[in-house]
Amino acid sequence: MKHYIHILLTCLVTTSVAAQPKFSRQHELIDGPKSITVSITGDASATIRYTTDGSTPTRTSKKYTSPLQFRETTILRAVEEIGDSLSPVATASYIFVSSVLSQSNNPAGYPSTWGQYTQIWGTAKADYEMDPEMTGNSTLRSKITEGLKQLPVLSLVSDRDNFFSHENDEDRGGIYIFTGPPVGDPTGHGWTRPASVELFGGPQQHDLSVSCGVRLHGGHGRLAEKNPKHSFRLVFKEKYGPKTLKYPLFGDASTGKYDQLVLRCHFGNAWQHWDGDNRQRAQYARDVWARRMQRKMGHTAVDALYVHLFINGMYWGLYNIAERVDEVFGKDHLGGKEKDIDVIKIEEDGGNSLEASEGTLDAWNEMMATAGKVGSAATDAAYAQLDTLLDIDNFIDYMLINQYGGNTDWNHHNWYAVRRHNTTADGPSQGFRFLCWDTEIIFEDVHVNVASGAVSSDKHGYVSQLFHSLLRNDDFARRYVRRAGQLLSADGLLGESSVVAVWDSLYHTIDKALYAEAARWGDYRRDVHQWQSRGSLYTVDDFYQPERRRLLTKYFPYRSSIVLDQIEDYVGISVAAGCHDLMADTRRRGEGTAAAGLYFNLSGQPTTRPTRGVYIKNGKKIIVR
């Protein structure tokens, strides 16, 4: 009998599962000292082990015995220990504003250099500090403090070596040291490390804590000489934590389920960029504007959430969280199952090769081959067949967003196309939809002409190839020009009022947070790495605001009519001709008249009192300024 009792007790002990400990206060942005209690949530006999430097607790970590007192930024991580069993790690980030303001360039245990340069000789100097010229200025210090509180905090926590180890090892090397760029030495590409992610605060009062994998993301932004502030990708897999993140990240309109998220650093037109002219144009809203505008037009679009990123408690700057375009994105936005989704993109592996990151290239190749056969007749069979392979309305609007923006870093890369290829309960199979992505190099020269869908090296890109094939068809050409007239009119979605409304909504989301970004990275090209040309101390008042004024006074008021003229010249069809059928339909419905002196807007509606914009009068285009 005693033998059986011993076996039973042994089984009970060895099968006990340690539970995550609980903190008396969760993650938060803090102004003053805090006392934190850690409590056992499982077996009362458990021991709590904890660390305060971001490292993973082990059996040899400190034993918790009494409340912890914090007066500076602390990453608290704790486990419950029962025998040989350790619970999953609980993590809470306590970010002190005073610690951010005094963030130095020599944090204990962190390296003084980062990765090797790729296209020039040398090694990147590490840069951790907040610029003391800004934080030491009482006026700017107050604005930085206010800016830190404007957005949610995204705290990314992992063992220090997972980010910054110089050991060239696939399992132990630091992902911020071995960045895996698309040119040169690819060491580090795809390396993924376990991490804890917390999202908290901000206007939405976010409250998320989850374990996941973290890896670097991007193309040339991985090159240390070009960009010291890298983008990341969060990967949700069972080996790191939950298989899928279920959280309303982007609000009620969001699907709320993700297996990957991208933390976009704002590489193009940003203060840390390697190119001096690029830095002058920093606005931190161009790419998000394109995505928001695509959604405003009623199309599938990639959402965004601005955040302040912290790495192991150190402020890393202004980022935006974006959905990763993959099979989960496709399923949630287009319907069907994950296996029904094709995602096509350009992989920046040095050769900018086309790939199906999900699904196959079969439908894409069929679409491109069919487009190559398109003829001019309205009844052209190839053009009719494209309706099942391409969402033409989406494609036209996608082209017009990029043409309006004057995108000069596009076509040969920086785009996604996604489709559902099976008939499901959500409907029949769909044509490819193009998504705005990495649209950072826009709103530069108000006169730049990308009406052809291409600039310089982009002229042979897949997007422009498809566009040129479609323009051979008269029906598509008129449809495209007519839509251009509608969107680019004064009251259109790409008219000044609509464009500025989206632009200003983004500005007012980050206007205070920009002061924190400036303090973190505004001095980099002056004080740390002066590649090609010595930079300035980039500040909101001296650099950001002048560029904002330029856009509001010299770009947005004129760009719509300029692009419309460029499109008419390139296609060889006037807006008046493109809108002729639309106006004829209006007259047939008895909604208008062709009487002399009557103006038609580009949606075909008549008016006797036109405001600024483009109109049709007596069959001719009229610009009212």
Where are these regions (language model features)?
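Conserved ATP-binding subdomain of kinase catalytic cores across diverse folds
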Residues: R172-L354
